[in-house]
Amino acid sequence: MPNYDLHCHSTASDGLLAPAELVQRAAGNGVDILALTDHDEISGLAEARARAAELGLRFVDGVEVSISWGGITIHVVGLNIDPGNLQLQQGLQAIRQGRTERAKKMAADLARVGIPGSLEGAYVYVENPNLIGRTHFARFLVEKRYVSDVKSAFQHYLVSGKPGYVPHQWATLADGLACIKAGGGVPVLAHPGRYKLTRSQMRKFLGEFKDGGGAGIEVITSSHTAEQFLEYAILANEFGLLASRGSDFHGPGESRVDLGKLPNLAADLKPVWHDW
C-alpha cells in the first residue's frame, strides 16, 4: 500500500520547516503521497508542489480550516482543494482575521501572570505574520524556560482555563465546510480524539458534519491511541465517512510521530483516497 500522509504543517502556518524542506523530509521517510495542510493558509502550497514534482512525490493541495462548534475549536482538513478558487481564498482570509488581536490579548494575559514580552517573543517564530497562533507562544515559553516543551506550554498556559488562553470565534461549521467545498476539496475531520467530546457530543457533531457535506474523518493520526484508532474506525463506518491517515507533523522535536510513520488503515475502512 502506498504511504499516505495527509496532514502536516509548514512555516506558512505553525510548522518548523519550510514547505520544500517538509516535502524533502517526507520523501526521505518514504512518503508516496503528501498533503500540506497549513492552518487557514494556502501560501505554502506552490513551493511544496514544485519540490514534490522534482522528487517524484505525489502532492495533494490541502488546508486545515478552523471552525467554532459548541464553544470549542474544531479543525477540518480540506484535501484536493483548488488553491486558485476565489471563494476558498476569500473564506480563508475571513477566518484569518482576528488572529493578531487575539495574540495581543494572549500576551496581555500572560503578562498579568508574570510573563512579559510574549508577543514579541512569539513573533520571532512566525514566518507568516497573518498566522500567529498558540504554537508560536508555546515556543517562546520553551525558549524562556517557563516550560520544558511545547506540550507542557499548552497544558500549563494555552488551553481553556489557563492564563494564556483566549477564545476566538472561527468559522461556523456550515461556513467552513462551504469554504472547502467551494474549492473542490474533501472535508475531513482532523484528530477527533483531541476535542474531548463525550460520545453523544461526538455523534451529534458527526451528524451535523455529514449533513453539511463533511466526507471523512482522521482515524490514524499521531495524537490517537490504539483504542482511538478502533473507536474512530467504528464511527467512520457507522456514519459512512471516508477514513484518513495523517501525522499532523509540525517539526522535528515537536511532533509525536514523524512524516509517514503511522500504522495503516484497517482493511474494512474506505480510505479518503479511494477515488483519487
Task: Annotate each predicted stretch with a short phrase.
Residues M1-I72, Y157-V159, A171-E254, L265, ...:
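An N-terminally biased module of ancient metal coordination in phosphate/nucleic-acid-related enzymes
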Residues Q87, E254-S255:
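A short acidic, helix-capping loop that chelates divalent metal ions and anchors anionic groups
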Residues R51-G207, P263, A267-W276:
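Extended substrate/RNA-proximal surfaces in nucleic-acid metabolism proteins
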